[in-house]
C-alpha cells in the first residue's frame, strides 16, 4: 500500500502597512487564531501552516513561488484581513501553479455597532480587500489559462 505524503496547506494573509505596526500585530494574531481553529476542527485532510502577513508585491511573489517549489505544500489559503492592494498580488498569482482557496470572510462574527470606530474599520476591511483580490485571482487564472 502506498503511503500518502504529509502535505500542508499554507495560510497567507494579505494586508498593508498603511495602518501601522499595531494593526499588523492584530492581523497576525487574527491569522494565528484562524489557523489554530482550522487545525483543531479536524475537517481538513492536512495541517494548515501560518505564513507571515503579506504586505508587498515582492513578498507575495516570493511566497507563491516558494509554495510552487515546496513538495509538501498542497496549496495556499489566502485571506485579506485589511485592505490589501490587489495590484500587489498580480505577479505572484500569475506565477502560482497549485490549488488556491480564497477565504472570503471577516474575522469578527459580530460587528460592534455600539462601539465601532475608525480603528476597528481600518483593521477589518476584509470585504473590500477580498473583492479586489478575488477579481485579481480571476484575472490571473484567465491569463494562466490562456498561456
Where are these regions (language model features)?
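Short beta-strand elements in bilobed, periplasmic/extracellular small-molecule ligand-binding domains
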Residues: 37-53
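Short, acidic/small-residue loops that bind anionic groups at enzyme active sites
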Residues: 94-117, 121-132
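Conserved small/polar residues in nucleotide/adenosyl-binding loops
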Residues: 136-143
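Short Gly/Thr/Asp-enriched flexible loops that form oxyanion-binding sites at enzyme active sites
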Residues: 86-96
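Glycine- and acidic-residue-enriched helix-capping/strand-helix junction motifs
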Residues: 16-32, 120-126
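Short, well-structured alpha-helical segments in soluble
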Residues: 60-73, 90-92
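Periplasmic-binding protein-like
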Residues: 73-81, 102-103
Amino acid at each position: 500500500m502506498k503511503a500518502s505524503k504529509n502535505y500542508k496547506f499554507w495560510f497567507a494573509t494579505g494586508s498593508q502597512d498603511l495602518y501601522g505596526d499595531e494593526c499588523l500585530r492584530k492581523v497576525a494574531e487574527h491569522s494565528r487564531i484562524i489557523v489554530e481553529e482550522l487545525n483543531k476542527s479536524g475537517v481538513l485532510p492536512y495541517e494548515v501552516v501560518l505564513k507571515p502577513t503579506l504586505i508587498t508585491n515582492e513578498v507575495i511573489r516570493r511566497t507563491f513561488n516558494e509554495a510552487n517549489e515546496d513538495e509538501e505544500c498542497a496549496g495556499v489559503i489566502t485571506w485579506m484581513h485589511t485592505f490589501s492592494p490587489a495590484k500587489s498580488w498580480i505577479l505572484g498569482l500569475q506565477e502560482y501553479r497549485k490549488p488556491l482557496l480564497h477565504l472570503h470572510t471577516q474575522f469578527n462574527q459580530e460587528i460592534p455597532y455600539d462601539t465601532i470606530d475608525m480603528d476597528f474599520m481600518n483593521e477589518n476591511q476584509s470585504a473590500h480587500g477580498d473583492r479586489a483580490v478575488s477579481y485579481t485571482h480571476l484575472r490571473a487564472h484567465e491569463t494562466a489559462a490562456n498561456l
